[in-house]
């Protein structure tokens, strides 16, 4: 069975960022810009595991990371690494939450997009931290562009 893939606009409308979270993201993005343009002498640290597969574990980790980030905020700007993709160069293997939200089930891109939007939104709400994620396919960016503060396009040769 072939399912129609919702547009990024449809997904964002179904799983929106509220105004408070939009303001948090705008503030953090402005701080990142200041760091990259030299207006701030802070150091950016993108910190976290290489894979975010289970929401509860991710949120537990992020709550602890937020406490550390608060202690060092005058010198270091922490961006949590919430990598929901596991890019593979040859196409086989587990590709992360985006493509397979439950590692025990079959791949489901639509449910994956919904799951990672919900997780990223919950992470911002609970910690005040906007995240970095990685992607292999540029077409996936519009589904998360209103949530993420940092994106890395990568290719992982783990299956080669």
What are these regions (language model features)?
Residues 24-35, 39-42, 57-71, 78:
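Generic N-terminal targeting/processing segments that precede catalytic cores or assembly contacts
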Residues 144-152:
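Active-site phosphate/pyrophosphate-binding segments
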Residues 52-53:
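Short acidic, Gly/Ser-rich segments with clustered Asp/Glu that frequently serve as metal-coordination loops
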Residues 48:
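Conserved, mostly hydrophobic/aromatic
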Residues 63-140:
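A generic, well-ordered mixed alpha/beta core segment in the N-terminal half of proteins
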């Amino acid at each position: 069975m072939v399912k129609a893939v919702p547009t990024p606009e449809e997904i964002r409308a179904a799983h929106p960022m509220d105004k408070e979270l939009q303001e948090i993201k705008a503030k953090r993005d402005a701080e990142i810009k200041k760091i990259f343009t030299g207006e701030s002498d802070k150091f950016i640290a993108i910190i976290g595991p290489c894979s975010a597969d289970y929401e509860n574990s991710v949120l537990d980790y992020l709550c602890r990371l937020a406490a550390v980030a608060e202690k060092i905020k005058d010198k270091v700007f922490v961006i949590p690494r919430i990598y929901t993709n596991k890019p593979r160069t040859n196409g086989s293997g587990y590709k992360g939450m985006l493509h397979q939200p439950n590692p025990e089930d079959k791949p489901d891109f639509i449910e994956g997009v919904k799951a990672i939007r919900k997780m990223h939104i919950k992470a911002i709400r609970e910690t005040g931290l906007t995240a970095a994620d990685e992607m292999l396919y540029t077409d996936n960016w519009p589904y998360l562009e209103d949530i993420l503060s940092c994106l890395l396009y990568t290719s992982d040769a783990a299956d080669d």
